[in-house]
């Protein structure tokens, strides 16, 4: 080491440590102090300044306190390394510490924090409490904590549930319990992040494709993935360097209805059947989360036009990106064929401008009968024909581009292709739209 480095060089950082809280008790000498039990990774000493982190609620300003005493196997010690400890934390009762809280040095990497967090949850709620949450646990734990506990519990018990029916029944019961708590807490959050597709600028559809015993391709129900805002700094660890993903914040609003309405719209408009929260093992169907519209007994013309199946297959195809592998090409063919099948019976909305007498469609802005007055449909230059008719799969997408007062003519694809090309959901993102020509439509039909 040179003189400059000796005098002015950076000091070597102290080794990091973590202590994931498995249990806690009020201090005997001072009621504001807290006695915590957990496994320490690294070395912790009496007098150390520690940072208190709840992974479900990461704050911008670190919460700090001091270790007052340490105990290992019933004996008081000044230092402990890589072992289970009992530590008394100054003013710990005021710092929001609960099972799963991580106490750590200031220089601890995020990966070590996450490891300490999951280990603590696993020991506390899977090993010791066997998936049973106390009333206090339910009050303190966040939705993301409960999701993590469920995934740890599932990982431990999934294999034996396949072998024993009683274990399978218990696992399903536990899932219902955990999901009920997640639902209750999810809608009370201030916000949540959603994984979006870079290709479509719409929520990414998480779905898996596999072949059954007969060789037929099976595609799982598409899900949206929701991420707690406290996890947003750790996305690289969760998703790697996947350039197909973007992340957008959903504000729950002052009435706490934003997340609920967002999930409801995913089901109605995008064909997304549910959500994954903090990982694919916490998968909750939309009908278990929100009230969905029921149209039984309504006149068909009164039912708002939606095409979730059409959107689902279009977006799954678009998410494939470049078809540079055999599997991608196969999936593309499957998705586009299913898109075509949905297209054959789809009712679509063509934006319509009436020349006078707008009151004819005041009560219901959609009609399947051409008005007996002059009107225009939205057109743009065609690809194979002179003009392309602009149509939308639902009112939400139509109004985004044409406003709340727009009227629409309900059309089907086959009746239009003889006269025009048709573009579905034209807008700012070409990959979220699809241009249909008569030639393409007939070619797919022949296959």
Identify what each model region corresponds to.
Residues 2-12, 113-447:
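An interfacial alpha-helical scaffold signature
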Residues 13-119:
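Beta-strand/loop-dominated core regions that host nucleotide or nucleotide-derived cofactor-binding catalytic loops
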